[in-house]
A protein has these predicted regions:
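Short Gly/Thr/Asp-enriched flexible loops that form oxyanion-binding sites at enzyme active sites
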Residues: 47-58
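Gly/Ser/Thr-rich active-site loops/lids in small-molecule metabolic enzymes
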Residues: 130-140, 184, 189-212
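ATP/nucleoside-binding phosphotransfer catalytic cores, i.e., glycine-rich phosphate-binding loops
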Residues: 161, 167, 192, 202-306
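Short conserved active-site loop signatures built around small residues
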Residues: 23, 45, 173
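Short glycine-/acidic-enriched loop or helix-start segments at secondary-structure transitions
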Residues: 50-52, 75-76, 184-185, 212
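Glycine-rich phosphate/pyrophosphate-binding beta-alpha loops
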Residues: 115, 119, 174-189, 264
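Catalytic core of DAGKc-family lipid kinases
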Residues: 17, 57-175
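ATP/NTP phosphate-donor binding region
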Residues: 1-39, 49, 87, 288, ...
């Protein structure tokens, strides 16, 4: 409110949500009204996801994010400045909307990453660790990884990428519109949110010792040599595709855990496709990098891909 007064803008309305899904309902109501409005999610990726679901496809609603949750992976997609530009309310109120792609999945709509297998199993276990004192985003994620590594992982899957099928056993899959999940793990360091494509990372089963050995590199995005090349250490078990859609079917009668932007469920089938230019987002200018998103903003993810 102070930033709005300083900029001589109308005072924003502040709504404290009282139940899960309330932000989604509000965004849908604004979208249906046709009135131009900027909606800011003040929370974590779950709160943002509610606004995204409610505003998807609308021309009159723009969605911004003030990161104050435990993971805050969405804002990591926009450069080395990190959260700081998104916590600058003056910059937020002066942001102009630009269009980004979304993920349409059988679990719902999301903006960042849909995952299945070990990494989704990790996300499934995070809430109980977050209840522990001093156990925030990355710490809870790491503890959940350790728990998941002690369980059985790997599923026989039929995978169709843009209609081309293959069958194999996979430990995990990450279907990426953005690059980050799990409190800073960089699954797709060259993913761009406005290129009309998904970066799909498939990982075959490896030993628990191997998982422990590569985890830090995977978190830092060092499994990718460049936009199209996996580093030699990962090539025997990891494959990257860029596509518009992917379908997965479990063939071993054991449900696989899947997640979209942190929301988890056991499934026997998973479908995902890109929704090009499906959402107006608000990016504060200090969050910009060196390649243009729709001619308005700079995105370091695209700069890497050049």
């Amino acid at each position: 409110q102070a930033a709005a007064r300083q900029l001589q803008l109308p005072q924003p309305q502040i709504v404290v949500t009282q139940y899960a899904g309330q932000a989604r309902e509000a965004a849908r109501q604004y979208a249906a009204s046709g009135t131009p409005v900027a909606l800011y999610a003040c929370g974590g990726d779950g709160t943002l996801n509610e606004l995204v679901q409610g505003a998807a496809g609308s021309a009159n609603v723009a969605v911004g994010c003030v990161p104050c949750g435990s993971g805050n992976d969405y804002v990591r997609n926009f450069g080395a400045a990190g959260q700081a530009p998104f916590l600058d309310f003056a910059a937020q109120l002066q942001a102009q909307p630009c269009r980004v792609d979304l993920l349409q999945t059988s679990l719902g709509i999301g903006i960042d990453i849909c995952a299945a297998g070990l990494d989704a199993q990790v996300a499934y276990g995070i809430p109980k660790f977050r209840r522990l004192p001093g156990c925030g985003g990355t710490a809870a994620y790491t503890l959940s990884i350790l728990q998941a590594m002690l369980s059985r992982f790997g599923h026989k899957l039929r995978v169709a990428i843009d209609g081309k099928e293959n069958t194999g056993t996979y430990m995990m899959a990450a279907i990426c519109n953005g690059g980050y999940y799990g409190g800073g793990y960089q699954a797709a360091p060259y993913a761009a949110m406005d290129d009309g494509l998904l970066d799909i990372v498939l990982v075959k089963p490896i030993s628990r010792i191997q998982v422990a050995g590569i985890l830090a590199k995977y978190k830092a995005g060092r499994h990718m040599q460049d936009a199209d090349t996996i580093v030699p250490e990962f090539r025997s078990f990891m494959t990257l595709y860029r596509a518009r859609s992917v379908e997965m079917q479990v063939l071993d009668n054991r449900p696989i855990i899947a997640t979209i932007d942190g929301e988890c469920a056991p499934v026997m089938e998973l479908k995902a496709e890109v929704l090009p230019s499906a959402l107006n987002v608000l990016l504060p200018r200090p969050a910009c990098g060196s390649a243009v998103i729709r001619g308005l903003y700079e995105c370091p993810m695209q700069a890497k891909a050049k």
